[in-house]
């Protein structure tokens, strides 16, 4: 069976409304949803569910075939890795999603496919917002969680080799789904993984990374998405886009009370598996 989760979301970071951000020891929690008991998406406060709690609850019930997050910022490598044992596929966007969300009447046939349902769901979501003249656009992808253990081992080696380049990352040219320094401190930068790898790897290494990523990620993009932060569309350079975001520790996050994203990141399962002791930003 599959699980569809629609609401607001903050990706892998703690809720902006919770006390977890004030206590780094509790900052391992990632959050989804805003539940204030009202049947509306026009809310800015309420209870949120942590991604690790979500994974535990699903595992208790035997897991599911797919999870569709009809919510912003939920396709990150940190989230997919947290859910790797709870679902076979994560379908989501690394960016802001269109306000109307998915058109479930047209997506249901894809959800009930016996095979290739994840690819079909990505295509169905994409088809809703890819027509010429559509004001919203979309970046949507699926992650095959069965491939994540080998991909994380591969990424661990890359991070170890290129740690110095990662910590000196030039952020301005990157495909960024949330611009921390321009849009506010409620979220860190959400860099597209492919954009980051393209900057730090040589041509041969990048070609190999693309091969490895293709075993994990399937992408569809209209070439742009509408951002409520800038009230305009943001164009996507598809050579920079795989449709999955990643966090990179940076000194810009240091000393930001309530927004200690480097410390929060250290407590994610992805950081434990891939970044080891190198997850602290260089000063």
Q: What are these regions, as identified by a protein language model?
A:
Residues 18-283:
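Terminal, contiguous helix-loop blocks that mediate binding/assembly
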């Amino acid at each position: 069976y599959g699980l569809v989760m629609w609401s607001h979301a903050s990706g892998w970071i703690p809720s902006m409304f919770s006390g977890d951000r004030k206590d780094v020891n509790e900052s391992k929690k990632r959050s989804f949803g805003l539940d204030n008991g009202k049947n509306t998406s026009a809310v800015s406060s309420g209870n949120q569910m942590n991604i690790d709690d979500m994974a535990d609850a699903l595992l208790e019930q035997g897991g599911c075939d797919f999870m569709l997050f009809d919510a912003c910022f939920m396709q990150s490598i940190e989230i997919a890795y947290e859910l790797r044992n709870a679902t076979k596929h994560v379908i989501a966007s690394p960016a802001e999603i269109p306000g109307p969300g998915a058109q479930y009447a047209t997506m249901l046939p894809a959800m009930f496919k016996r095979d290739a349902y994840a690819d079909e769901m990505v295509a169905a979501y994409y088809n809703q917002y890819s027509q010429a003249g559509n004001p919203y656009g979309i970046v949507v992808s699926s992650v095959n969680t069965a491939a994540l253990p080998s991909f994380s081992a591969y990424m661990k080696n890359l991070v170890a080799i290129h740690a110095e380049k990662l910590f000196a990352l030039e952020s301005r040219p990157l495909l960024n789904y949330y611009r921390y320094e321009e849009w506010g401190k409620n979220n860190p930068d959400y860099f597209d993984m492919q954009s980051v790898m393209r900057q730090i790897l040589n041509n041969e290494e990048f070609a190999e990374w693309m091969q490895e990523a293709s075993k994990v990620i399937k992408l569809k993009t209209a070439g742009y998405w509408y951002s409520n932060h800038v009230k305009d569309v943001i164009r996507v350079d598809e050579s920079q886009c795989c449709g999955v975001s990643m966090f990179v520790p940076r000194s810009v996050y240091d000393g930001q009370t309530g927004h200690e994203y480097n410390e929060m990141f250290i407590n994610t399962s992805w950081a434990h598996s891939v970044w080891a002791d190198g997850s602290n930003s260089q000063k």
